[in-house]
Amino acid sequence: MRVYADGSALVRYLPAPDHSVDWQRWAEQHGPELLVTSLSLIELRHALTTTPAHVRARVHALVDRLEVVRYSDQAVAAAATIDAGLSPFASIHLGVAVAHPDVTAFASYDGRLADAAATHGLEIVSPGLADGWWHAGTRAAARPPALS
């Protein structure tokens, strides 16, 4: 199983967001399975701008071990055809995950994006949240501010 992680998952490497401890424990065990893009890393780096230097250094050391994948033509084509009410950046996240032949799961804490990923047949990984949290009705309570 390879897991694509969006920015809403990666910011859980910071101490403040909800479920950060759950994410960090899960990621410690599954780090080699994670794939990210430059977009995921940009979202994380944006969140790091107000954190202390020692936290930034720790997070950079963790994410430097992640595999960064490029945007393939197939990923861009998939992103362009996704019709789930997603932002263009969220569509790119999903397009990369859907087009990558080894990705079977999607790590996210963004309800709309998790819902779209599940609709496209990906297992949702959101340590600390209940299975199916992204479904309509529970989405508003569980969804953190969107990064995408």
Predicted regions and their residues:
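A general structural signal for well-ordered alpha-helical segments in protein cores
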Residues: 20, 41, 56-59, 76, ...
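Acidic, PIN/NYN-like endoribonuclease modules and their adjacent C-terminal/linker elements
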Residues: 37, 41, 98-148
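Short, well-structured N-terminal submotif of metal-dependent ribonuclease cores
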Residues: 1-36, 48-60, 122, 132-136, ...
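Alpha-helix capping/helix-boundary segments
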Residues: 9-10, 40, 75, 93, ...
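Short beta-strand scaffold positions
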Residues: 5, 35-36, 70, 88-91, ...
